[in-house]
């Protein structure tokens, strides 16, 4: 139970940070947004923005498992983070990096929607459609494209 509480607290802290990061992207502060994403991933998940952008799809999905169960909440939070990271890369005209982020975000949202205990945002359909459009515009690498099939 303690492990789940820690995970939920990390997700909550990450969610608060996402609001600030989204504001940076709205203000076209792409470098600052990527630095903030990297900082949050380091603090909350002991990782990096580049690591999350390059993580193999199966390992990305495994990050959202706890005690053998898939956490739709964790998947949606990571998907939001990856979407923002993709937006920052797209703002810097880094199409390959943007595609890698968008593709992974789409993969996570699809998994969240298919989860047995899926408590998902009522806007998930809109988010899925938008991520599909962005993934079409900024194709992900072959590993993610294969996982999305």
Protein language model regions, located:
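N-terminal alpha-helical interaction modules that lie
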Residues: 1-75, 110-111, 133-149
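Residue at a conserved register position within TPR or TPR-like alpha-solenoid repeats
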Residues: 24, 82-85, 89, 109, ...
